């Protein structure tokens, strides 16, 4: 009888004692750059990563979009901080100056910034991509299919090392007789494209972030001319995806792909487990985060043209050399 009473009492306790609820999912904040979703560039690539992460990880999302002004960027980031986000992801280098200030004001908040390494703060993970590796493969591939013996890279004025250590090195490793040239641009990208085509380049690597549709127009205009030497293009995604159309796609030889979606998944997974990326990107400058490269699939090289597809084995060998480049 005593045993029955004890059991009955235990059953009553079981009914009355509340079952501990699972912990509420963390909140991930994301600050999209100008235009937000639908830009077919870094915003969309980041959103794709969020969606993929949501299939296997438990978290909520708070999203904001900036109009691009410094005041608005700060306003958007502060709104995410106020919502107690476990991690705030800023898409694009435009948020750099804002995070440089707010990271010190809110040292317990974890931030990440995509495609930028300018914020020196231990609570900011800079997520960047080994662009030199991609440039090496672009140069190697351009030389493989060049018929004029001259290939070109259109670059920003601060990309001299990218040309020397990446594109030019890839060209020389591919075919020593092919001449790599570079056109640094501070003004018109279309003029730069016209000039390198006039100089004899028949494959162009466009390394600039934020594409200029005029470059594509110049290439198309050249290629539709009778008896013209056809020009191929190697571009970067998601940097230049916005300007790629059904008309220009047929002139794409290859694409260097920055796997922003993969980086977003990794960042969120780290945050949920209570960690962050703290690899040394530049110890002297105090920059931390992660550099994604060919190893691990952070940078991919997508062959577009049939002509280049026949060079696939050689490009795979070149990729093994490219992934040893640290920058």
Which residues make up each language-model segment?
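A residue-level marker of the well-folded mature domains of exported/periplasmic proteins
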Residues: 22-327
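Bacterial N-terminal signal peptides that target proteins for export
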Residues: 1-7
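Hydrophobic helical h-region of N-terminal Sec-dependent signal peptides
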Residues: 7-13
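C-terminal segment of classical bacterial N-terminal signal peptides
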Residues: 13-21
């Amino acid at each position: 009888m005593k045993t029955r009473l004890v059991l009955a009492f235990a059953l009553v306790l079981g009914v009355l004692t509340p079952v501990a609820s699972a912990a509420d999912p963390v909140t991930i904040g994301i600050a999209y750059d100008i235009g937000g979703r639908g830009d077919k560039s870094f915003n969309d690539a980041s959103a794709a990563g969020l969606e993929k992460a949501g299939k296997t990880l438990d978290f909520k999302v708070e999203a904001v979009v900036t109009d691009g002004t410094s005041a608005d960027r700060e306003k958007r980031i502060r709104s995410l901080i106020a919502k107690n986000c476990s991690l705030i992801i800023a898409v694009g280098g435009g948020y750099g100056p804002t995070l440089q200030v707010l990271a010190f004001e809110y040292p317990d908040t974890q931030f990440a910034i995509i495609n930028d390494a300018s914020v020196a703060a231990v609570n900011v993970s800079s997520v960047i991509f080994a662009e030199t590796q991609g440039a090496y493969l672009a140069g190697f591939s351009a030389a493989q299919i060049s018929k004029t013996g001259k290939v070109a890279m259109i670059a920003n004025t601060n990309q001299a090392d990218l040309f020397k250590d990446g594109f030019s090195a890839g060209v020389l490793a591919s075919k020593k007789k092919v001449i790599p040239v570079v056109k640094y641009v501070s003004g018109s990208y279309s003029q730069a494209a016209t000039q390198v085509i006039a100089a004899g380049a028949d494959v162009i690597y466009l390394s600039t972030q934020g594409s200029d549709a005029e470059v594509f127009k110049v290439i198309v205009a050249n290629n539709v001319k009778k008896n013209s030497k056809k020009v191929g293009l190697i571009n970067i995604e998601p940097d230049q995806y916005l300007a790629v159309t059904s008309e220009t796609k047929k002139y794409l030889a290859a694409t260097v792909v920055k796997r922003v979606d993969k980086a977003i998944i990794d960042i969120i997974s780290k945050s949920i487990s209570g960690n962050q990326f703290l690899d040394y990107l530049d110890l002297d400058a105090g920059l931390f985060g992660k550099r994604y490269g060919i190893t691990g699939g952070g940078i991919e090289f997508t062959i577009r043209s049939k002509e280049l597809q026949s060079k696939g084995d050689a490009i795979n060998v070149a990729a093994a050399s490219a992934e040893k480049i640290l920058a």
